[in-house]
Amino acid sequence: MSKTHFGFETVEETDKAKKVAGVFHSVANNYDLMNDLMSAGMHRAWKAFTIAQANVRPGYKVLDIAAGTGDLTKAFAKAAGPTGEVWHTDINESMLRVGRDRLLDKGIVTPSLLCDAEKIPFPDNYFDVVTVAFGLRNMTHKDVALAEMRRVAKPGGRVMVLEFSKVWEPLKKAYDLYSFKVLPWLGDKFAKDADSYRYLAESIRMHPDQDTLKTMMEQAGLDAVKYYNLSGGVVALHLGTKY
């Protein structure tokens, strides 16, 4: 059997999805708190930048993968308007439920779908914009997921990946201290779940760096791939176009 990484642990590929599911079932009800802890609240600015770069227009079809509590979905649904079609999707039932309920509470009526990014249940050339925010690093076969995102994008459509990445070297020591010492402590104190937060920190370190992910997107068939480093490389937004 093939091996892969679950944080710093080496596991069977067939086991990773179950382990990741366990983490997100555990953190679903505290996911927004988790984002605040992991990013010191900066995730709102990173998402706002992503929303601006997506440039969703009225009538657009948008697929939000690993959409979680629906921050991007909400913004996209408002931008696409009543003539648009915005899908809120996640592979994790707990996350999907929390996000769906939150969207409804805010008056956003848009379809929610349980969706595996490695087997996207939509036809070719369907979406104007395909996004995944803070989800790619948890996927077992990132190359397959990227190829699927490209497949369902229309010609001229954009694929966008917002993800924790590799920080600039001067920040590395402080970032490691925060990730491996402070974050698990905060997870234990506020969510009673140090292990899940420890995994999330480890998963960031195992994720491809900015240039490697750019190459992976190009290998998936995307063109004009570029990325923006945000907050000193703590996060990067990658964008590619399907021609």
UniProtKB/Swiss-Prot annotation:
Family classification: Belongs to the class I-like SAM-binding methyltransferase superfamily. MenG/UbiE family.
Role: Methyltransferase required for the conversion of demethylmenaquinol (DMKH2) to menaquinol (MKH2) and the conversion of 2-polyprenyl-6-methoxy-1,4-benzoquinol (DDMQH2) to 2-polyprenyl-3-methyl-6-methoxy-1,4-benzoquinol (DMQH2).
InterPro entries: SAM-dependent_MTases_sf, UbiE/COQ5_MeTrFase, UbiE/COQ5_MeTrFase_CS
EC number, as in UniProt: 2.1.1.163, 2.1.1.201
Organism whose genome encodes this protein: Burkholderia multivorans (strain ATCC 17616 / 249)
A molecular function (GO) term: 2-methoxy-6-polyprenyl-1,4-benzoquinol methyltransferase activity
Matching Pfam families: Ubie_methyltran
Family annotation (Gene3D superfamilies): Vaccinia Virus protein VP39 (3.40.50.150)
Residues noted as binding S-adenosyl-L-methionine in the record, renumbered to the chain: T69, D90, D116, A117
Keyword annotations of the record: Menaquinone biosynthesis, Methyltransferase, S-adenosyl-L-methionine, Transferase, Ubiquinone biosynthesis
Listed name of the protein: Ubiquinone/menaquinone biosynthesis C-methyltransferase UbiE
Catalytic function, reaction form: a 2-demethylmenaquinol + S-adenosyl-L-methionine = a menaquinol + S-adenosyl-L-homocysteine + H(+); a 2-methoxy-6-(all-trans-polyprenyl)benzene-1,4-diol + S-adenosyl-L-methionine = a 5-methoxy-2-methyl-3-(all-trans-polyprenyl)benzene-1,4-diol + S-adenosyl-L-homocysteine + H(+)
Presence of keyword NAD: no
Keyword check for Repeat: no
Pathway: Quinol/quinone metabolism; menaquinone biosynthesis; menaquinol from 1,4-dihydroxy-2-naphthoate: step 2/2; Cofactor biosynthesis; ubiquinone biosynthesis
One of the GO biological process terms: menaquinone biosynthetic process
